[in-house]
């Protein structure tokens, strides 16, 4: 006999069942109680939701009531859903045709409904504060735009977008600064599109642009235009820059433009020819404003927009300035374009670190002659054969030479100003799609390239200004991902490195070149992954040969040799972990107690080793904490030193990675072990400060050279400081 709770519901589904008079009366009482309970429950629910009970509302259909009861959180609904347990379903098997299926369907609906409520509650609990603040429902964003944003993978607004949406949407002037990779383009694109679509007028042919976005590079202009196009289907977006056809741009002007993005040079050309009318501008955006208002672009920007601005007029276009780096001079120069009352959003502010917080900054000391080979090793260890990397060089010639570097095993392509625009676009498209893994570029790729999959950025030398370093390193670690930036330097460039640390608020981790073990591990992983692409049919052809190899060499040795050959690592040439020079091995000598300087280590070496062995020791420097030293010896001498070393409290070893050291400076940058710096001492092995004549002379020369370099560097810095900043000069290193 079914339970009483189900009786009233199954009456419509079942054939009439025989029942006694007492059972019939009991059933009628139960139905009346249930009906009264349901009506009271619905009244309470309506009162809670609406504040008052509306007696004029039409009664809800029975199916709707049932759905509300099943999906609600009332005890009645929960009890009802409990009735559809597996045991109850098994008891209904004898019902007429269709009844079991109907109950099972209801059971599944109830279960899935409860599960969806639980999962939504759980999802709401796991939302971060950033996601809650950036929820689309908090902003005036249309459903159409939200759909397009989700198509781009954007599910909520990032902090810079949250902070700037209101001021931009309300038409206020704004200066905004945020770190690279935090979504600055959408910060102005989303509210501007919503504002234009809200006030959209009748679409006319040949209409003048209402929004002008100026960017310093073609690549950035292209990226910004794409971001606009991705989130609007109603507005016309055009992108003008050099190296492309004038005629196609003229056709776009004739058809009408709502949002114009471009570089100053090409837009100025269209203005001077009279083809482009900017008299109807309502919004002006300068992206990467620190570069747009610098001497290289400031005059062109002024020529383009000056007619749209009148002194102290509230009718001037809304002005929006965005960048990751905003020196103080930017604010001073920008005031002539801003209304007297403007908003300022700064997500960097007085924080020490100006660069992206998702990037790890490494520095490798390396002579320029060794750099191409070491860069190949760095790519292998930190990026692998599948990762994507960007290498920045200072000149176009360096870019071409680096891309042809035989030590770079991955396919690499060039990007610089002398390459035709059509080829530049093909190159960038291929890099985005992963057709090749390494992009070698000048500063044209430092700003605006938004490719989250970039794992590694390599700067072949410290850049000429801090802003360039920040923007270059910001090509990785984007959209919440982490990345690595490796900066190569020579001893004479230590001052530039320290200046970048100070101004960017970062600390470089000094590391050595990738060790042999690092390379073996990385290459073996790539080789193992490559085996997965071999088909079983191909494997069958090689089974006899494999069997012979196993019999001759053994399974492990045979496979190890095969992996070494596949990875191209059949031999390794040791390098100094200190200077990256070939043919040297770095060794550490750890002291049982703290030492004052390297002279203590020299004394211990002279006491335990032959003079011939000691004469090969070079580039000695203190370990962090003064608990020992590290130094280089020729590869041929490393085993002899270890064999001679015994009966000492000091521990001599060969490290796999460069330990933390006090900064090393090789005064003459020579790799000859007999030419010592001031720290390394003379041939007798004593300290250069107090040692033999040769060591002392070399030490004095080293220190004098250092002081001379400091004086020259000081004069250069003084010259830079005396330079006028009114035009937006950046801190340069000559």
Curated annotation (Swiss-Prot):
It is found in: Nucleus, Nucleolus; Cytoplasm. Residues 165-344 form the Helicase ATP-binding domain. It catalyses: ATP + H2O = ADP + phosphate + H(+). A motif (DEVD box) lies at residues 287-290. Residues 679-698 have a biased composition (Gly residues). Residues 717-734 have a biased composition (Basic residues). The modification Phosphothreonine is found at residue 244. Residues 11-20 have a biased composition (Acidic residues). ATP binds at residues 178-185. Pfam families: DEAD, GUCT, Helicase_C. Residues 1-131, 664-734 are annotated as: Disordered. The keyword Cytoplasm applies. Its main location: nucleus. It comes from the Eukaryota. Residues 699-709 have a biased composition (Low complexity). Interacts with C1QBP. Interacts with the ubiquitin ligase CTLH complex through GID4. Interacts with TICAM1. ATP-dependent RNA helicase that may play a role in various aspects of RNA metabolism including pre-mRNA splicing or ribosomal RNA production. Also acts as a viral restriction factor and promotes the activation of the NF-kappa-B and IRF3 signaling pathways following its stimulation with viral RNA or infection with RNA and DNA viruses. For instance, decreases vaccinia virus, herpes simplex virus, Zika virus or dengue virus replication during the early stage of infection. This is ATP-dependent RNA helicase DDX50. It comes from Mus musculus. The gene is Ddx50.
